Amino acid sequence: MSLTYDPSETIYPFPQKPVPLSEQEKLTHVEKIKALLKEKDAVLVAHYYTDPEIQALAEETGGFVGDSLEMARFGNQHSAKTLIICGVRFMGESAKILTPEKNVLMPTLEAECSLDLGCPADKFSEFCDAHPDHTVVVYANTSAAVKARADWVVTSSIALEIVEHLDSEGKDIIWGPDRHLGAYIQKNTGAEMLLWQGECVVHDEFSAKALRDMKALYPDAAVLVHPESPASVVALADAVGSTSQLIKAAKELPNTKLIVATDKGIFFKMQQMVPDKELVEAPTAGAGATCRSCAHCPWMAMNGLKAIESALVEGGEKHEIFVDEALRVKSLIPLNRMLNFAAELQLKVKGNA
């Protein structure tokens, strides 16, 4: 299936890296952030892929570190009036969709996601309109507008079960936006699926050849892979799953050395769970200066201490997430379909990334 618009051929301009802070500057920002969180009745909610110092601060101040859906759920259930979402834009939108009555702020609204950027709502809607007999299933790593166009919103932890269910009902499926995850699901379910050709700039860079070479160096190591990675990389995995599932696998596998093919931001929480195990970054297609993301999302890196402080001090249009109410209500329908399906199966739904 070819697309007139092929996001897999797009080269995304990466944001500039934040200016490094001195240790004294870090301490000053941390103390100010702690005071502002109390003053503003706010809580820090951080994704696994943010920098370790951000995750540590979230935990230290009574906030939360988790995957995208867990973040939105935590914000929904916490008593704070203001949520500081440290992640990428769709995560802030997800929090607002589930908790419209709260102020949802982000360190920067320019923290994008290549899966979201690669799936513009207008182009995706045209694709769906061209196949009106297909059920539209989208990954949670999408904008509110794309979610609103879908029949189902899924996370990687339950995508297989939902697609199997739809396939058993004889449904043909449009899947978006991640082509690698879509191909993984298609292979494991045998479902008829039209795949949107988006990709995560981090996971797309992992190299099967380099991973095989690394495995030869560490034959006793287990390989943990996120399913947004290319099929050739997934084929080498001892465990495949979302961020939360990979952390769980790290605990359960007997291996003392783990090669991890996902954003290296996950090492902070994973190492907490397995302090006696050695974690090794899986190799990317490039090495050193020749890789682009180098196993760390450039937009996640924008969630720095200075930016968090600015969000708490300034708020407003530079930091606050707004979702059109009609769009919010419409996007809740496919999201609730997933949650209700999970409840019937008594599955605990985890997020994606």
Swiss-Prot record:
GO molecular function, one term: 4 iron, 4 sulfur cluster binding
SUPFAM superfamilies reported for this sequence: NadA-like
Compartment(s) of residence: Cytoplasm
Gene Ontology annotations of biological process type: 'de novo' NAD biosynthetic process from L-aspartate
Residues in the signal sequence: none
Top-level enzyme category: transferase
Pathway where this protein functions: Cofactor biosynthesis; NAD(+) biosynthesis; quinolinate from iminoaspartate: step 1/1
Residues binding iminosuccinate, per UniProt: 47, 68, 139-141, 156, 226-228, 243
GO CC term, one of those recorded: cytosol
Cofactor binding summary note: Binds 1 [4Fe-4S] cluster per subunit.
NCBIfam families: nadA (TIGR00550), PRK09375.1-1 (NF006877), PRK09375.1-2 (NF006878)
Its job: Catalyzes the condensation of iminoaspartate with dihydroxyacetone phosphate to form quinolinate.
Protein family (similarity comment): Belongs to the quinolinate synthase family. Type 1 subfamily.
Name by which UniProt lists this protein: Quinolinate synthase
